[in-house]
Amino acid sequence: EIGSGLVGSEMCIRDRNTGNVARTCAATGTRLHLVKPMGFEPDDKKLKRAGLDYWHLLDITYYENIDDFFEKTKGGKYFFFSTKGTHRHSDVEYPDNCYLLFGKETKGLPEELLMQHPDDTLRLPMIDEARSLNLSNSVAIAAYEVLRQWDYPALQNKGELHNHKWSDLNNMT
């Protein structure tokens, strides 16, 4: 297991984004934490389709609200992702048992929450003219930075070809 909680997606309102986030979590062995209200139902067809056939690999936990999330994940280290963050996501060290929190696609996390955690509010670099990145892309970028720092534990680090073997390259020269 990668950690007790890597990605917390708070109040995600687009079912396709959550499906894509779920697929990223499933493919990386990362637990997905969803905080209500979500704006969709977990059994939504679009949500299931976006996650494709990865649902059996997904470890998912639901929380009634943000207070419920913090109460049940005490002892973890929280990182808050926002376009308003002052620290880059790649400039921090991610400990075991960390949670990456993302807000609504349209509004982000509440500013009051960010003000309580200024040193742990992180930003993905982008040009000034861009409002934000897509939520599921942001989650993937952040999750893979954590996994890179952890040297991709339990993940397959080498792919195999379908019709050839990489070792065949040595025989061709």
Could you describe each region identified by the protein language model?
Residues 31-37:
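Short internal beta-strands
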Residues 116-167:
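Structured adenosyl-cofactor binding patch, chiefly the S-adenosyl-L-methionine
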Residues 1-7:
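Single conserved hydrophobic/aromatic residue that forms the stacking wall/gate
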Residues 11-12:
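Active-site loops and adjacent core secondary-structure elements that bind or stabilize anionic groups
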Residues 18-27:
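Histidine-anchored nucleotide/phosphate-binding helix
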Residues 33, 61, 79, 120-122:
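Hydrophobic/aromatic beta-strand patches that form the interior of the parallel beta-sheet core
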Residues 44-111:
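S-adenosyl-L-methionine/SAH cofactor-binding core of RNA-modifying enzymes
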Residues 7, 28, 50, 74, ...:
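Short, structured coil segments at secondary-structure junctions
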